[in-house]
Amino acid sequence: MLNLISSLQKSAQLLTLYLDKFRKDYGVTQPEAHVLAVLHVRGETSIRNLHHTLGHKPSTLTSILDRLVARGFITRETSQTDRRSFNVELTLAGTVPAAVIRAALHSLENKIVRRSVSTDIRGITRVASTLEELIVSTRRAE
């Protein structure tokens, strides 16, 4: 059967295709684009917060951040309040791509919302939360 899983997989693939245009424009991958969009919305944030928001494995997130630092799109500094933590922030060079990516995602989300009913949106949110709970608890048990 796998109807729900197939739909989720297809949605993830379609988002990747949608964000692929930013690879051409700014040289960023889909996961890098999501990091830039989150930073544009939140401003300076901790790596822990990014990990919680995006769900990447710590090593994967570190690689994504390394590439964005190398391109000059973000900075990664030791937290002033907790020397064991690091904060990430957009640079001036990263602000434009982050704003463009965030605007594109916002526009896409608005189009989806306009074509959906509120129960659809709540259902998708519940499915995503349930998936996160199940995957995170399974990974912890391993």
Locations of the language-model features?
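N-terminal leader segment of winged-helix/HTH proteins
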Residues: 1-26, 71, 119-122
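Residues within helix-turn-helix
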Residues: 47-48, 59, 66, 86
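Ser/Thr-centric signal marking residues that sit
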Residues: 29, 59-64, 91
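N-terminal helix-turn-helix DNA-binding core of bacterial DNA-binding proteins
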Residues: 17-57
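Alpha-helical transmembrane segments and membrane-interface helix-loop junctions
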Residues: 47, 139-142
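Short, locally clustered residues in the helix-turn-helix/winged-helix DNA-binding domain
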Residues: 9, 37-41, 102
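Charged, amphipathic alpha-helical coiled-coil/dimerization segments
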Residues: 67-129, 136
